[in-house]
């Protein structure tokens, strides 16, 4: 990082984020994304995920500041003439690899997407989903009955995955969480921790009577018949965090929250 980094400021449409961006641009200037050294994202976790999806391929480190309802992936926003440049110089990086999802639908079309938090399959109607679970080409569960199932990254393991009673994964552990959502059968199965290079394939066993949708972060595809998930080997993003509250510490602390 250069001594005076060029910053591209991005803000969610929320009024506090827009106002904060205006103040920061006046103080530090603003650069186009392709000219910037760092991206500063102002908003909540939803906007951070949107920023990573839209601009992750640009390979720019992202420093987020919380101006939204949820900010697990963000640093605190401070507007008391805080020296942002000093914070950026001290910031610690966290490297994240997204999940790659490939979907086949009932109509025969295929689609793909990335997920930095999780890929989740959910029943579309009142009827439970019936799914099979294959890992690296081997069927591990012939029939999973329940509301659905998900695969979560370490960064996403504290979100939907944790609410579904999945494990919290340490950052840098090179693991994924495979977590059922309200499982009925097998009733005692509570999920698994997988190596990050595991290929996970879900098949919908009765897609006409029991339709299923899949969501990669916020991108939903309905009426799926097969979903394949693996960690990306090509895409990697870097988030920057204040050293006193870095992402690794946040994930660790979540395990002791009461």
Curated annotation (Swiss-Prot):
GO BP field: NAD metabolic process; NADP biosynthetic process
Q: Name one GO cellular component term.
A: cytoplasm
Cofactors needed by this protein, per the record, are: a divalent metal cation
Superkingdom, natural source: Bacteria
Keyword Cytoplasm in the entry? The reply is: yes
For this UniProt entry, what is the primary localization, expressed as one broad class? cytoplasm
Keywords, in A-Z order: ATP-binding, Cytoplasm, Kinase, NAD, NADP, Nucleotide-binding, Transferase
Q: Which GO terms describe its molecular function?
A: ATP binding; metal ion binding; NAD binding; NAD+ kinase activity
Task: Please tell me whether the keyword Zinc is annotated for this protein.
Answer: no
The EC number of this protein is 2.7.1.23
Database matches in Gene3D superfamilies? Probable inorganic polyphosphate/atp-NAD kinase, domain 1 (3.40.50.10330), Probable inorganic polyphosphate/atp-NAD kinase, domain 2 (2.60.200.30)
Provide the reaction this enzyme catalyses.
NAD(+) + ATP = ADP + NADP(+) + H(+)
Catalytic site residues?
45 (proton acceptor)
Which InterPro entries does the record associate with it?
ATP-NAD_kinase_N (IPR017438), ATP-NAD_kinase_PpnK-typ_C (IPR017437), NAD/diacylglycerol_kinase_sf (IPR016064), NADK (IPR002504)
- Residue positions annotated to bind NAD(+) are 45-46, 117-118, 147, 155, 158-163, 182
Give one Pfam hit by family name: NAD_kinase
Compartments, record wording: Cytoplasm
Instruction: Give the family, as the similarity comment puts it.
Output: Belongs to the NAD kinase family.
Functionally, this protein is described as follows: Involved in the regulation of the intracellular balance of NAD and NADP, and is a key enzyme in the biosynthesis of NADP. Catalyzes specifically the phosphorylation on 2'-hydroxyl of the adenosine moiety of NAD to yield NADP.
User: This chain belongs to which protein, by name?
Assistant: NAD kinase
Query: Which species is the source of this protein?
Result: Xanthomonas campestris pv. campestris (strain ATCC 33913 / DSM 3586 / NCPPB 528 / LMG 568 / P 25)
